[in-house]
């Protein structure tokens, strides 16, 4: 399960992060110099986390705002599309919410059309393919990002009963295949994890802790190649942050959370 392979055009191909994943998932043989290097990286982050965690939580509060400049691009290899044909690209673009604001598109490689009003905001661009040349779509943008802290005690204090007949509740506790799985296996596993606990906030914490203890982080193969991500995590015993999040969501929804 550490060494992920795929048969592609009759050839066995190894996932490019196989070696690093093997090290991450086998602590006994993890090179000491890598462990020390990781500790140094984490040490740089800890003071920032401690500063944010000391902020007092108030309703909708966001603290420690930082301005970020970003460059995002995608490049289509030369001659992947016949010369003269139009290549259309949709690049992901952030949008305002509680933790990010003041987005500004600074530049783009071609005319950009920004979508809004959907869950997935994008910038649309198109270019003609040129023989022998790669086609690059690029945009530069800036925005501000802030931190929010949610303490369990505050969440428990403000907890209200669910309206289980509401469309909102039904929507966010429903199965959404292929990657939000609510079936007998998930329900049984979720109930086993939480035991006799009935408070949904504490149930969510128990499930979070269980996943953290049992499914270590490792680099992920492309999500589009995985038929059902939460089941994949259960089968392979590891996952990256997005993969274990989908397992977490599936287990919560299985309990009606």
Predicted regions and their residues:
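Cysteine-centered nucleophilic/redox motifs
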Residues: 89, 207, 234-257
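Intrinsically disordered, low-complexity N-terminal segments that are enriched in acidic
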Residues: 1-150, 154-156
């Amino acid at each position: 399960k550490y060494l992920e392979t795929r048969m592609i055009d009759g050839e066995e191909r190894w996932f490019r992060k196989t070696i690093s994943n093997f090290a991450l998932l086998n602590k006994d043989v993890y090179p000491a110099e890598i462990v020390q290097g990781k500790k140094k990286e984490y040490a740089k982050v800890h003071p920032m986390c401690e500063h944010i965690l000391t902020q007092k939580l108030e309703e909708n509060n966001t603290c420690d705002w930082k301005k970020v400049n970003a460059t995002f691009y995608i490049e289509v290899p030369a001659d992947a599309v016949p010369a003269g044909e139009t290549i259309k690209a949709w690049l992901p673009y952030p949008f305002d919410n509680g933790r990010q604001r003041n987005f500004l598109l600074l530049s783009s490689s071609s005319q950009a059309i920004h979508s809004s009003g959907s869950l997935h905001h994008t910038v649309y661009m198109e270019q003609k393919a040129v023989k022998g040349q790669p086609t690059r779509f690029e945009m530069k943008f800036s925005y501000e990002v802030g931190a929010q802290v949610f303490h369990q005690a505050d969440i428990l204090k403000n907890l209200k009963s669910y309206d289980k007949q509401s469309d909102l509740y039904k929507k966010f506790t429903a199965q959404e295949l292929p990657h939000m799985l609510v079936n007998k296996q998930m329900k049984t596993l979720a109930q086993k994890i939480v035991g006799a606990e009935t408070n949904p906030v504490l149930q969510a914490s128990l499930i979070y802790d269980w996943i953290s203890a049992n499914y270590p982080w490792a680099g992920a193969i492309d999500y589009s190649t995985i038929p059902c991500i939460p089941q994949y995590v259960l089968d392979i015993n590891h996952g990256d942050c997005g993969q274990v999040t989908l397992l977490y969501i599936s287990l919560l929804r299985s309990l009606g959370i």
